[in-house]
Curated annotation (Swiss-Prot):
Function: Forms part of the ribosomal stalk which helps the ribosome interact with GTP-bound translation factors. Is thus essential for accurate translation.
A GO CC annotation given for this chain: cytosolic large ribosomal subunit
Quaternary context: Homodimer. Part of the ribosomal stalk of the 50S ribosomal subunit. Forms a multimeric L10(L12)X complex, where L10 forms an elongated spine to which 2 to 4 L12 dimers bind in a sequential fashion. Binds GTP-bound translation factors.
A Pfam family: Ribosomal_L12_N
UniProt cross-references to Gene3D superfamilies, sorted A to Z: 3.30.1390.10, Single helix bin
Family: Belongs to the bacterial ribosomal protein bL12 family.
Name assigned to this protein: Large ribosomal subunit protein bL12
Entry-linked InterPro entries: Ribosomal_bL12, Ribosomal_bL12_C, Ribosomal_bL12_C/ClpS-like, Ribosomal_bL12_oligo, Ribosomal_bL12_oligo_N_sf
Amino acid sequence: MAITKEDILEAVGSLTVMELNDLVKAFEEKFGVSAAAVAVAGPAGAGAADAEEKTEFDVVLASAGDQKVGVIKVVRAITGLGLKEAKDIVDGAPKTIKEGVSKAEAEDIQKQLEAAGAKVEIK
């Protein structure tokens, strides 16, 4: 009498995890294969959808522009840093002002800095 698929499935279903692990290793050795999962590429449009759903943004001061003093004041107000720390950020542009903020907050910060004469990027 031949063994059917159902018989094999029933026998495998009754094994413990350790016994299944041993069985898989035996198959790998006997047939020269690996039980590692094969990575399958997703649809091409999936990457674009992930980029649109970004929820956290970084606000980067690209340059201070001509109104450096005004930009320093806005940086101090946004970050809560002291005068020297805010000046160091403005002088060392491009620098990240805020990290991991919502889109609305990032746009608000961008408006404040641009009103003071700075060039800002949201990443």
